[in-house]
Structure formats: structure tokens, C-alpha cells
């Protein structure tokens, strides 16, 4: 499946409005508003809300396309690096429990992309003792099987 820039527009549109808010909140060390879905997207199949489904990454190909997009990749890498400035804080104290789990899923997803920036692994190592999200890996594995069969 080939993804076009138009497929990623949902992220660009949302980030256009709220990326600076998300960045500012992380810089202050405390997430306060709702933006996780499109700043740190997860693989399709994890979220149950309509918003989570809308911003879900469909498979590893779309994750790769996301990281090849000049704006989306820059923003994801930049805000992920910003998180690392809080190495002495728990990620739950910054994002809350649920959003910390979403971050782990997102970092697991993007760490699987070939030649991905090492920041995704570094976030996993720093805040999650290097442990990837098993549900994300399972969903990626099942989506790659579907792609191979198609």
C-alpha cells in the first residue's frame, strides 16, 4: 500500500493547531491538554475512541512515510528529544499513566522503522527500561503478515 502526503494531512492539520501547545507543555514538564493521538501516534488497533482510530498509523509503511515527511518527522523527533531532558522525572508525572502507555506504544512503533532516529529507542530506554510495547509489536507483526499475503 502506498501512502500519499494527503494520507498524512490529518496529522499536519492537527499539529498545525496544537504542536506548539504540546511542545510548550512538555517543556514545562506537564501535559495539560489533549493532543497525544496526533503528536505521538500509535498503531491501528490499540485505541478504541473515534479520535484514536482516526489518527492511528495503519502499518509499518505508514510509520515509515510519517518519518520521511519533513515536517512530521522533525516535530516527532524534536518533541521526543525534549522529553529526554526530563530523565530524572517519571514519564507518568509528565504525561499521566494512560498517555505514558500511549507514548511507549508510539516509541515502539517508530523504533521499528528501518533507519529510524535513535531517539525513539532512547525514550524507551530512559522511561520504560528499554521495554517495548508488546501489543504494538503483535499488531505490527499481524499487519506485516496481511501485507505479505495481499
What does each model-identified segment do?
Residues 23, 64, 107-108, 125:
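Amphipathic alpha-helical segments within well-ordered protein domains
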Residues 1-20, 141, 145-147:
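Extreme N-terminal tail/first-helix region
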Residues 12-25, 83-91:
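Short amphipathic alpha-helical segments and their helix-coil junctions
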Residues 25-60:
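Hydrophobic/aromatic-rich, well-ordered segments within soluble, folded domains that form packed cores
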Residues 65-114:
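Mid-chain, well-packed structural core segment of small domains
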Residues 115-150:
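Charged phosphate-binding loop/patch that engages nucleotide di/tri-phosphates or the phosphate backbone
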Residues 45-51, 111-121:
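Short helix-capping/linker segments at secondary-structure and domain boundaries
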Residues 31-38, 75, 99-106, 119, ...:
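Residue-level detector of well-ordered alpha-helical segments, enriched
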Amino acid at each position: 500500500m502506498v501512502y500519499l502526503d494527503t494520507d498524512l494531512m490529518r496529522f499536519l492539520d492537527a499539529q498545525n493547531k496544537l504542536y506548539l501547545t504540546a511542545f510548550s507543555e512538555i517543556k514545562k514538564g506537564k501535559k495539560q491538554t489533549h493532543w497525544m493521538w496526533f503528536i505521538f501516534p500509535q498503531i491501528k488497533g490499540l485505541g478504541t475512541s473515534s479520535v484514536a482510530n482516526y489518527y492511528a498509523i495503519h502499518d509499518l509503511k505508514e510509520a515509515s512515510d510519517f518519518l520521511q515527511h519533513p515536517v512530521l518527522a522533525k516535530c516527532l523527533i524534536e518533541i521526543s528529544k525534549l522529553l529526554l531532558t526530563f530523565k530524572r522525572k517519571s514519564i507518568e508525572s509528565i504525561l499521566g499513566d494512560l498517555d505514558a502507555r500511549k507514548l511507549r506504544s508510539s516509541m515502539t512503533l517508530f523504533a521499528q522503522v528501518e533507519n529510524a532516529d535513535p531517539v525513539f529507542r532512547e525514550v524507551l530506554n530512559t522511561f520504560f527500561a528499554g521495554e517495548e510495547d508488546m501489543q504494538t509489536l503483535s499488531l505490527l507483526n499481524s499487519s506485516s503478515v496481511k501485507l505479505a499475503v495481499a
